[in-house]
A protein has these predicted regions:
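Short, functional "switch" segments adjacent to catalytic/cofactor/reactive centers
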Residues: 66, 74, 79-82, 151-343
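Short, structured secondary-structure elements
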Residues: 1-167, 242, 247-252, 273-274, ...
């Protein structure tokens, strides 16, 4: 009781949950851009443990908080869970492939986090002794096919600390101003060299020092990184929304939510990808959960909404159903393991 009454209790067990949720302050890959608002999801998890939030609500907020109540900032912050995996879209990336990488990641992560079952073994084909067939894998993926990225406006909560915001803003803006000066000075130097070396020639050696070219690239990236960092103290959160998919070429910084989520774009096909290849469409599937859980728990097969329906909310409600044999026992096993070092079930 003494330990659970401590505010550090939530911090300690949030660390375990954040490991499961693949929490990261940056997006990974080559650019590894910062996620300046990720701290809000981290603090949400700490608060949830300290406030004894009911587990069913904890699950629903993270998987479908925006579909439950988009006007509740806490719900929007919670959906940061869906974006914690590594992701990058550069000018050299094929959006169709990076989109599929995220769909694979979120499908597998939801399966492992809430149902204790790795899903990606079923991505390419069925396995004789695996209770998750390929059709179930792509059925669960279809739940997320209308889920899109956005940094959404979410007012700061009274429980969120804003200490140090003013100092952070001042420091970051001074760094940006410094890089802007360097950028201007280097641009002037490059222009002088171009005129001196090439004159009015249209083709030829530009006369630039390779070091100057490298500096130009470095300054440009530093400007991007520090402008992104300023979002850390803005009332926005790393979140999602339900709508059509819009192709993106090069993502740097904040992704804004469209006024009409169902206006521009296209609907991802809800199909089995033969061999796991996004370029090889197979049979159509419907959004759904795991058939093995339904048969083991004696659950009635649930019909999930398609089209513009709230697919993620349907999945979250299916997972926390009292008849679902997996979700509750998975969390009990995690908590037991985190307290005593060994789970009730060793796997």
């Amino acid at each position: 009781e003494e330990l659970m009454a401590s505010s550090h209790y939530g911090e300690h067990f949030a660390r375990h949950w954040l490991d499961v949720a693949r929490y990261a302050d940056s997006a990974g890959f080559a650019n590894d851009y910062a996620r300046p608002n990720a701290w809000r999801y981290r603090d949400y998890v700490v608060r949830s443990f300290n406030n004894d939030k009911p587990y069913d609500r904890f699950v629903k907020e993270q998987v479908a908080g925006d579909e439950m109540d988009p006007d509740n900032p806490e719900n929007l912050v919670a959906t940061g869970f869906l974006r914690m995996g590594p992701w990058e879209q550069t000018g050299m990336s094929v959006f169709k492939e990076t989109r599929q990488m995220w769909l694979d990641d979120v499908t597998d992560s939801v399966g492992q986090t809430f149902l204790a079952h790795a899903m990606q073994c079923a991505k390419c084909h069925d396995h004789k002794f695996d209770p998750v067939p390929t059709r179930d894998y792509y059925g669960m993926m279809a739940v997320f096919s209308t889920t899109q990225f956005a940094e959404r406006k979410a007012s700061f909560l009274p429980s969120e600390s804003k200490l140090g915001f003013a100092g952070f803003r001042s420091l970051t803006q001074s760094k940006i101003a410094g890089y802007e000066r360097q950028k201007k000075e280097l641009a002037q130097k490059i222009n002088r060299l171009k005129k001196a070396e090439t004159g009015s020639a249209k083709v030829g050696d530009n006369g630039l020092d390779p070091g100057d070219e490298a500096s130009q690239s470095r300054i440009f990236k530093n400007l991007i990184r520090h402008r992104i960092e300023l979002d850390r103290i803005e009332p926005v959160t790393h979140s999602v929304f339900t709508g059509k998919t819009v192709s993106m070429k090069n993502v740097q910084g904040r992704l804004k939510m469209p006024q009409d989520p169902w206006g521009k774009g296209y609907l991802d096909p809800d199909v089995i990808y033969d061999g796991g290849s996004v370029y090889s469409q197979g049979d159509a599937v419907k959004p759904g959960g795991l058939s093995a859980a339904e048969s083991l728990g004696g659950m009635e097969a649930r019909s999930f909404p398609a089209g513009r329906g709230k697919r993620r909310l349907a999945l979250a409600e299916w997972m926390v159903s009292e008849k679902n044999p997996l979700a509750a026992r998975v969390m009990v096993n995690r908590i037991w393991s985190w307290h005593f070092g060994l789970g009730i079930a060793g796997n």
